UniProtKB/Swiss-Prot annotation:
Oligomeric form and interacting partners: Heterodimer of an alpha and a beta chain.
Note: The synthesis of this protein is regulated by a complex control mechanism that has been termed autoinduction.
Gene: luxA
Name of this chain's protein: Alkanal monooxygenase alpha chain
Function: Light-emitting reaction in luminous bacteria.
GO biological process terms on file: bioluminescence
GO molecular function terms attached to this record: alkanal monooxygenase (FMN-linked) activity
Pfam name, any one: Bac_luciferase
Keywords, alphabetical: Flavoprotein, FMN, Luminescence, Monooxygenase, Oxidoreductase, Photoprotein
């Protein structure tokens, strides 16, 4: 089993940006002490939904502040920045940390990012594929060049080269079927969403495995991650109530982030994400409190045993043994750390990998 910690860097209304940044550093260090394998940093722009416009910089700080902890991005919006510049940053982190950096990528969800950074969001799928191939080749070859409809530049060395053999490990935040299929074609591990239930997670892994095998990948050694909003307390109601105010503001902040520009919903290629929201509303979850209650049904929020039951059910359904939690909904930094430590002592030791049964005929 492996355990990760998502550091959201959401700014609640009652806290300053300076306080959120202090939390980031402290929680990163505490994560290492609590036995977490990796902390994950999210890229967001122009919104208090997440204060990290450049996760590479934050990753560099946390890698320098820790000794064994891996630090990853979950995720870099790959199409919105030049691929050479991105690989330079990834390789630098890979070298300076001696292989402790994890390169999580995504296609991007927010129209605002593409518009401000001058990238056509309607081309996000094609750009994701093009940028990924350039970066992957650059990791192994040590140079990059491009001459296609999306980008043109002459052959250049990418320095420093990668420290890790084959380059820093790459992960994909995958929410739609199309992104799941894309990740499977390339044999890349997925970070699964915390907003889907066990059946959806199982179906996503089954789709991935089917496609990955068609492309010749060994599906038994792919380090997929299950992600969760997490709050652990011996009092179940206390765990739920302490998260409610944070999650309510956080959800509202997410909605605001997706609609900074009035015509954001006209972008092509995001029908799954729009449909997911429509389905959510049809199920009666438009009310913020109902959305929070539904989140409690599918995330480890409650007593240690309740948390174990929810996570173990997903492990058994998917076979995934890399568990990534976000604890920031727990209130103050001291309350967050208390929940992390209780998770370490009363949840981590009792989660088990899915048992693989073999049958022999004698």
């Amino acid at each position: 089993m492996k355990f990760g910690n998502f550091l959201l860097t959401y700014q609640p209304p009652q806290f300053s940006q300076t306080e959120v940044m202090k939390w980031l550093v402290k929680l990163g260090r505490i994560s290492e002490e609590c036995g977490f394998d990796t902390v994950w940093l999210l890229e967001h722009h122009f919104t208090e939904f997440g204060l990290l416009g450049n996760p590479y910089v934050a990753a560099a700080y946390l890698l320098g502040a820790t000794k064994k902890l891996n630090v990853g991005t979950a995720a870099i919006v790959l199409p919105t920045a030049h691929p050479v510049r991105q690989l330079e940053e990834v390789n630098l982190l890979d070298q300076m940390s001696k292989g402790r950096f994890r390169f999580g990528i995504c296609r991007g969800l927010y129209n605002k990012d593409f518009r401000v950074f001058g990238t056509d969001m309607n081309n996000s799928r094609a750009l994701m594929e093009c940028w990924y191939k350039l970066i992957r080749n650059g990791m192994t070859e040590g140079y990059m060049e491009a001459d296609n409809e999306h980008i043109k530049f002459h052959k250049v060395k990418v320095l420093p080269t990668a420290y890790s053999q084959g380059g820093a490990p790459i992960y994909v935040v995958a929410e739609s079927a199309s992104t799941t299929e894309w990740a499977a074609q390339h044999g890349l591990p997925m970070i699964l969403s915390w907003i889907i239930n066990t059946n959806d997670k199982k179906a996503q892994i089954e789709l991935y495995n089917e496609v990955a095998q068609e492309y010749g990948h060994d599906i038994h050694n792919i380090d997929h991650c299950l992600s969760y909003i997490t709050s652990v307390d011996h009092d179940s109601m206390k765990a739920k109530e302490i998260c409610r105010n944070f999650l309510g503001h956080w959800y509202d902040s997410y909605v605001n982030a997706t609609t900074i520009f009035d015509d954001s919903d006209k972008t092509k290629g995001y029908d799954f994400n729009k449909g997911q929201w429509r389905d959510f509303v049809l199920k009666g979850h438009k009310n913020t409190n109902r959305r929070v209650d539904y989140s409690y049904e599918i995330n480890p929020v409650g007593t240690p045993q309740e948390c174990i039951d929810i996570i173990q059910t997903d492990i058994d359904a998917t076979g995934i043994s890399n568990i990534c939690c976000g604890f920031e909904a727990n209130g103050t930094v001291d309350e967050i750390i208390s929940s992390m430590k209780l998770f370490q002592s009363d949840v981590m030791p009792f989660l088990k990998e899915k048992q693989q049964f073999s049958y022999y005929i004698s």
